[in-house]
Every structure is written in C-alpha cells, then in structure tokens.
C-alpha cells in the first residue's frame, strides 16, 4: 500500500466506542505499512482520543452543530466533550506522536446547522484552536442510506426530523464564511 499512497479509514458507527479493538486494528495496520485514518465524532473519553491519535496518521472529525442543545436534539448527545477533544487534538504538536493532520467534516443540513450563525460560530471555534484543521469539508445532506434501512426493515429517520440539503446558494455562503475566516474549505470532501 505504500506505493499507492492508499490506506484504511475506520469509520461508523463510531470507532472510538470500541477503543481496544480500534487500537489493536490500528497497530496491525501500522505494522503492515498502511496509512491509517479515523473518521470520528470524538465523542469519547480524552484518554481514548489521545491513544487513538498516537496510532493513526489522520483524524476526520465530524462537527455537526456548535449549539449544544441543537447538537443534543439531533444527535442524542451534547457537544461539550466533542469540542474539548477537538481542542486537545488541535493542541498536539505536529512533531508529537499524536500530532497528525486533522480535517473537519460538517454534514450540512438546511434546518439544522447551515445557518449563518452556526457557520460563524464554527469558524470562530476552529480559528481559536492552537492548530487549525488542515481542511474543512462541507458535506451536503443526502438520504442515500434510506434504501439500505428499507431493505433492513429499520426506520431511517426514527425521530421524523425534517432533513434536507441546503440550497446551492446556502452551500456557497457556508463555504465563503469559512474561507473568509482563513480556513481551507471544500464542498463534498
């Protein structure tokens, strides 16, 4: 894999919910020469985040909403632990074992987190970190997983929440807001 630049990304559910397995898998992948990325919400104990950070080369961090009450409403958990862990990984020196690049991934949902206020709060928070993210990826909402849930006989949106992608104009506004704050931003990752 070192010739191709390829690697392995551990993702959801949430790999940090299973720290022993995640660390064991990351160690084995490292022994085999794979680049290791972890796609996470960072909703975990700080010691778990620190251990995983030392065992991978890249964090892809989902950041859903800056207002903790909104975050709780749409995800079931508040965001304080997530923001604390994000501050921690941003504080790691690039020369430290834990100090790898990290990217922020924002699933943009029109009615939830694509407002000017939330994006401004996100930009302010990210710019306040010791080390800014290497990139911010805006990921417009989609319902691709809906068919999978139907095939499995599970409910796609159990809370019946109104979910839709922001308009192209709103996506462009979100990108501009973050870029104007000095962040490197893409739409679609």
Q: For each of these PLM feature ranges, what is it?
A:
Residues 1-150:
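Conserved AdoMet/S-adenosylmethionine-binding subsite of the radical SAM
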Residues 151-160:
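Short glycine/proline- and charge-enriched loop/turn segments
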Residues 165-189:
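A cross-taxonomic marker for long C-terminal extensions/tails that follow the last structured domain
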Residues 34, 154, 183-184:
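Short aromatic/hydrophobic-glycine micro-motifs
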Residues 114, 118, 162-166, 170:
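Short amphipathic alpha-helical interaction segments
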